[in-house]
Amino acid sequence: MSRERFSGNLRNRLHSDEWLIWQDQYEAKENLKYESLFALSNGYLGIRGSHEEGTKITLPYLYINGVFDKSETFMRELSTLPNWLGIRLYVEKELIGIEDCEILEFSRVLDMKGAFLGKRVRVKDSKGRETLIEGIRFVSRNNVHRMGIRLYVTPLNYSGIIEVESIIDGTIINFYDAPRFKVKHTYMTANEKLAADGCYVEVATRENHLHVGCGCRIEAYADGKQILGNRMISRFGEQSVEFGDIHVEEGKEVEIVKYVSMYTERECPAYALHTTIEKEIEGFVETGFDQELKAHEDVYKKMWENADIQITGDDELNRAVRFNIFHLMSTGNEHDDHVNVGAKLLTGEEYGGHAFWDTELFMLPFFSWVFPKTAQNLENYRYHLLDAARANAHKNGYKGAQYPWESADDGTEQCPDWTIEP
């Protein structure tokens, strides 16, 4: 089976092949495709499948469902928010990354049944040092305000010190690769320590001034003991960085764990965002990465019991159907009836994150049959925006209600009357 390429850390957690989507070769030109395919969502937020160390071609976007902004653009868009993925490892100031070293092994895998992203990378740096990194990433469906990354790092032919950077990046902008449409929808209101350890960044949307907080804390372990030394917090403009170092021995594995939490003032007052996130991360660390991941997998196990479709005789087709179900049910929100399911779900910024008539025509039947509470929320979303639909009808000379072709958070028409194409 394909999972046999991994060590026991991931092999024992991965499901059988018909649940797995693989990337077995790194090609920079394919980055944006795999960032979309490997996006993870939990109904509350979604983050693209970018690499932790960063790459030249990337759109490392994170969205919280329903957080829109217009600013100087011609329509309200899902706002790109501070990205917490960043983890960079250095040996003697040399970055251990897939675009900075020779790649000896490379595999990434989306486990749809467990709803997590795994990876295995073995690289050789300019001085011949080989490092094996395996990792697992998830955004919890058990507690939608918890996200985590665990890296298993093994220096294969050297001993020494590995320096670690954990980053929250608040510089991300919408349509970074489209000069005509570039825009930054947020401004920073805080860049500070989370507590004694950890980083905290807070931003607000430019138009409605909705505050969003993001906090993270990194730890390192060997044989169950914390080993991260020389910890410090630095701020570089709109980036917040937690630094530490690890003494490593040849052939001995260490674990690096990043605990993350995000809230908006839709869930708690703006003045309480920092303390709420601080307490959430304290609870996450106390609960433990494994226990939260297990609770997350248990939620998806129940979801798949309702949603799975089994096709015998064609594993590839079965995998494709499950892939569609996975992303669809990962985006639907059973707890919030003020958000919808956009045409690109929470995997990218095309269509501005807007909901079309596709929701009712193609998605609602699925949710009605499999997840009726989510279906009810999708209908309530339209009900909450009925007054805007009436205003839209009146604007266009009609009686009654006319729902917009493209809908964001306020029910006004977001489809432009005209647009410019190259």
Positions of the model-derived regions?
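Acidic/polar, glycine-enriched structural segments that form the non-catalytic walls/loops
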Residues: 2-40, 44-351
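Alpha-helical support elements that line or immediately flank enzyme active sites
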Residues: 323-328, 359-374, 385
